[in-house]
Amino acid sequence: MIDFDGYRPNVGIVICNKAGQVLWAKRFGQNSWQFPQGGINEGENIETAMYRELYEEVGLTKKDVRLLWASKYWLKYKLPKRLVRSDGSQPVCIGQKQRWFLLQLLSDENLIDLKTTKSPEFDGWRWVSFWYPVRQVVSFKRDVYRKVMKEFAGVLLNESKKPETVEKPRVERTEKRDFQKRDNQKREFRKSARTWNNSHQKGKAQ
């Protein structure tokens, strides 16, 4: 699907871990690295497209991540002329217009799987520092990456300032009854001890 200006609607995905590093993926059979990204199908909403691409490219599902932020605007880049192809019957795609998503990985990184489809986009991945991709991505994507990471940096900074919430351990009913029973036993013991102590003191006084 290509718009009237020749740009293909696309979603881009930045996945971060708890250390603030981001997932950097190697294109299949090439010495070229980038963030996961992919086209939006006709009639598909942007968020649905993002989760579909997330699974197709890195094998993660919605439950494996937390959505932290979505870019507010479309960001565009043009393809170099050598990459612009046309067979004469289809509209010419001159570049991509993208909406970007920032996700935090919740599940174990071992769930990352680059072979969920017959034609995988990537054949390798690694964690890199937050700003590393801006310097390393191909030149025609660099301006988009710079804008995306600048927007997402503020989001991660705010996330780091939030107090950590510790989930209270769940206590089953049987455990609650055991706790209450032990508390009652302690109270009875203290009561008996006070009674014995009082009577013992009285015996001494006599």
From Swiss-Prot:
Q: Which GO terms describe its cellular component?
A: cytoplasm
Protein's gene = rppH
The record's section on Pfam families has: NUDIX
Q: Which residues form the signal peptide?
A: none
Output the GO biological process annotations, alphabetical, semicolon-separated. Answer: mRNA catabolic process
Q: Which GO terms describe its molecular function?
A: mRNA 5'-diphosphatase activity
Which keywords does the record carry? Hydrolase
Q: What class of enzyme is it?
A: hydrolase
User: What organism, scientifically named, is this protein from?
Assistant: Actinobacillus pleuropneumoniae serotype 3 (strain JL03)
Q: What is the official name of this protein in its record?
A: RNA pyrophosphohydrolase
Residue ranges of the Nudix hydrolase domain? 6-150
List the ranges annotated as motif Nudix box.
Answer: 38-59
The entry assigns this protein to a family as follows: Belongs to the Nudix hydrolase family. RppH subfamily.
List its EC numbers: 3.6.1.-
